């Protein structure tokens, strides 16, 4: 299994958020930008306005796992940042709900 390449630096996130195209789902907003490389880079951001750290970490784990399962079927050469929508209820953050939402976002972005 391939390791997920992640965006780590603040300027990498800012670059994708400012120059990338965005696609809105029910639970997440995906910002996608071409990177002219032969691999995808991935990042997740959850606002501190959403609960305590345990809730935010749970949300990030679910989103990362959904990305990991879709990673093999995606087109290569993109930077992808997922933002969790603040108006979504934490109780709705079930893996089955989020994976359907992320699949729809990738379909709309023509990444499959």
Regions found by a protein language model. Give the residues of each.
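Positively charged, solvent-exposed patches that mediate nucleic-acid binding
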Residues: 1-112
């Amino acid at each position: 299994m391939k390791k997920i390449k992640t965006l780590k630096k603040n300027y990498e996130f800012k670059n994708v958020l400012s120059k990338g195209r965005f696609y809105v789902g029910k639970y997440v907003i995906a910002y996608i930008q071409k990177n002219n490389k032969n691999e995808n880079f991935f990042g997740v951001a959850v606002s501190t306005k959403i609960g305590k750290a345990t809730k935010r970490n749970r949300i990030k784990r679910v989103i990362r796992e959904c990305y990991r399962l879709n990673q093999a079927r995606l087109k290569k050469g993109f930077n992808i940042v997922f933002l969790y929508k603040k108006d979504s209820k934490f109780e709705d953050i079930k893996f089955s709900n989020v994976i359907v939402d992320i699949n729809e976002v990738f379909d709309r972005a023509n990444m499959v």
